[in-house]
């Protein structure tokens, strides 16, 4: 692995983050052959925010106007991609406040809230309400894990006021939650 001078590393770090704002400090450390603390110090010196803040910024710039059914700050997790009436993706980092203290397992309502708010966000109308949800928790999620929820809208059926959204949540490549959300929607007057 090539060793970079501090100045070169910081320039390349800035380019790497501009190209992929979702890259982690750990991935950057591996890429540049340094420890994570060095990457953090470089980010601070360059006034580059941590990953969580970069994700929030990208989401607020790209998706704040796209989501009509609820304010972007009411979405549980960070939306990283959305195509109204088609699909959406969000991420949720499980922290200490989301888990049971004794076993560090995430409380189920956080996983449900991420999936349900993503199903709501993908609806292109001002009013979107969950009429029915069928959810299956496949495996426990633990503190420190990152949940990636992916929503897909099914093609319209006869009842145009109801749309079915399927959500699958993953930790890595492993499914942790499967959900089917029936969403009532209308344009408010």
From Swiss-Prot:
Keywords for the protein's UniProt record, in alphabetical order: DNA-binding, Fatty acid biosynthesis, Fatty acid metabolism, Lipid biosynthesis, Lipid metabolism, Repressor, Transcription, Transcription regulation
Molecular function per GO: DNA binding; DNA-binding transcription factor activity
Keyword Transcription regulation among record annotations: yes
Entry-linked InterPro entries: HotDog_dom_sf, Transcription_factor_FapR, WH-like_DNA-bd_sf
CDD domains, per the entry: hot_dog
Domain of life: Bacteria
Gene Ontology biological process: fatty acid biosynthetic process; negative regulation of DNA-templated transcription; negative regulation of fatty acid biosynthetic process
HAMAP family in the cross-refs: Transcrip_fact_FapR
NCBIfam families: PRK04424.1
Family per record: Belongs to the FapR family.
Function: Transcriptional factor involved in regulation of membrane lipid biosynthesis by repressing genes involved in fatty acid and phospholipid metabolism.
Protein name (database record): Transcription factor FapR
